[in-house]
């Protein structure tokens, strides 16, 4: 008796779930603005993610904060590369290079220690990260004025 009631309850729940899936899919397909709203939502999430990355940048006028940020980014980048997460590791290394006082020397060291494909990935990401840091710094200066 109990097993039969459980089976009926499971069947009803399964039917309700499938019905909801069909309803949602039909609603999604018939909405002409669904794709536009989805694109806008993804764009907002991407912008929020970029802003979150910029918000953790130190004040470039504070040498101690820059040094701490530099060391943290180098350490985190090395750890992520060791774990095989090359994209994230390269992102952190490019952040460190962008705030480094002597980026050419750091690039030479990284060229000797990193595998060539990872170093090429680093070189391709470096201009965009540097540009974001420059724009973030100019935004911070605009906020002060």
UniProtKB/Swiss-Prot annotation:
SUPFAM superfamilies for this protein: Mitochondrial import receptor subunit Tom20
Tell me which Pfam families the record gives: MAS20
- Please verify whether the record's keywords include Aminoacyl-tRNA synthetase: no
Q: Name one GO cellular component term.
A: cell periphery
Q: Where in the cell is it found?
A: Mitochondrion outer membrane
Q: Report TM segments.
A: 7-24
- Consequence the record notes for mutating residue 68 to R: Defects in mitophagy
A GO BP term here is: protein import into mitochondrial matrix
**Keywords, ordered alphabetically:** Isopeptide bond, Membrane, Mitochondrion, Mitochondrion outer membrane, Phosphoprotein, Protein transport, Transmembrane, Transmembrane helix, Transport, Ubl conjugation
Q: What does this protein do?
A: Central component of the receptor complex responsible for the recognition and translocation of cytosolically synthesized mitochondrial preproteins. Together with TOM22 functions as the transit peptide receptor at the surface of the mitochondrion outer membrane and facilitates the movement of preproteins into the TOM40 translocation pore. Required for the translocation across the mitochondrial outer membrane of cytochrome P450 monooxygenases.
User: What NCBIfam families does its record include?
Assistant: 3a0801s04tom
- Please state what the protein is called: Mitochondrial import receptor subunit TOM20 homolog
């Amino acid at each position: 008796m109990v097993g039969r009631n459980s089976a009926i309850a499971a069947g009803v729940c399964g039917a309700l779930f499938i019905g909801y899936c069909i309803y949602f899919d039909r609603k999604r397909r018939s909405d002409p603005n669904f794709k536009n709203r989805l694109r806008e939502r993804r764009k907002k999430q991407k912008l929020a993610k970029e802003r979150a990355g910029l918000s953790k940048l130190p004040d470039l006028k504070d040498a101690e904060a820059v040094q701490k940020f530099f060391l943290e980014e180098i350490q985190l980048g090395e750890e992520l590369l060791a774990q095989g997460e090359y994209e994230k590791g390269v992102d952190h290394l490019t952040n460190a290079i962008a705030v480094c006082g002597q980026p050419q020397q750091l690039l030479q060291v990284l060229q000797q220690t990193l595998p060539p494909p990872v170093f090429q990935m680093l070189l391709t990401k470096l201009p965009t990260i540097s540009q974001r840091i420059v724009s973030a710094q100019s935004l911070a200066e605009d906020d002060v004025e």
